[in-house]
Amino acid sequence: LEYLDIVDEDGRPTGRTVSRREAHDRGILHRTAHVWVVGKERGRFRILLQKRSEEKESFPGMFDTSSAGHIPAGAEPLPSALRELSEELGITASPDLLDFAGTFRSRYEKVFHGRPFRDNEATSVYVYKGPVDAGSLKLQESEVSQVRWFDLDEVWDEIQRGDRSRFCVPAAGLQVLRGYLGLQ
């Protein structure tokens, strides 16, 4: 079982923990870490998105943040971000290759695989500054079925129009990234 810190509205651990399953059953506030892999081509920003495996408990088969995961109880955001980047994409990075970009909150209720899912997260956002060859990444097959580069503006425009047919990227997370890149 994976345990998470229950956090207050500012994302600070309260000293209590909850199982990941219970956090999503009851919508209990917990922490996650997201990492954006960003490139530039012909003067335009592009982002590497992962396609979530069909077995994922939420948003199966959709394109999502480059790398993301829950922060285990007792852990801190930066080491968790580095761990997820390594586990999901096979990118082994040192802490100096991740820039802290900001935080955001997300809360929603949906049904996946016929089961209610209540998410309530305080997310720390990082940007990976190292080189990436998408073709040589070692993907965690249980979580990620593929990765693909997308034009950042294309993803942003689609999400702003409310079109969620391809992307489950949190709009607030993309907004933090855009602010970091000076696009706001």
Named regions from a protein language model:
Residues 75-113:
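Internal catalytic-core helix/loop-beta-alpha segment
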Residues 1-43:
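Acidic, metal-coordinating catalytic segment for phosphate/diphosphate chemistry
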